[in-house]
């Protein structure tokens, strides 16, 4: 089981990586507790943990990329999409483990948003 920076590294300046490292530690502890309680330590037992954490990392990663994009401005985003204020607030305070597609679709109109990373598989380059 991987958690924190061992699972994925995210921008240290924005401090979101610290939050995700601590939160992933809590999440993995809950997943291990459930697996031990159920007597099932198979990989499938931990898929929910992995999917939730990957989704949270991707949400924060997109927000970090937008933050550093010189053409992006939170004020302009909220002027055009005031109904997304709650989604943006949730994302900024760490409520990352839900669907933020409408928010990031709107942000993509102002900033370049990265494609999702591949997590958990071997990262090899063909030589």
Which stretches of residues belong to each language-model region?
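C-terminal helical "tail/cap" subdomain of flavin- and related membrane-associated enzymes
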Residues: 33-127
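Conserved mid-domain beta->alpha element of the FAD-binding
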Residues: 1-59
């Amino acid at each position: 089981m991987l958690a924190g920076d061992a699972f994925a590294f995210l921008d240290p300046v924005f401090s979101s990586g610290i939050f995700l490292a601590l939160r992933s530690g809590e999440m993995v502890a809950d997943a291990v507790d459930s697996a031990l309680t159920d007597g099932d330590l198979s990989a499938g037992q931990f898929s929910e943990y992995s999917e939730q954490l990957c989704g949270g990392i991707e949400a924060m990663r997109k927000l970090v990329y937008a933050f550093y994009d010189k053409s992006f401005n939170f004020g302009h985003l909220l002027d055009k999409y005031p109904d997304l204020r709650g989604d943006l607030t949730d994302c900024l305070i760490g409520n990352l483990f839900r669907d933020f597609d409408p928010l990031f679709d709107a942000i993509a109109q102002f900033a370049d948003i990265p494609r999702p990373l591949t997590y958990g598989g071997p990262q090899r380059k063909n030589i």
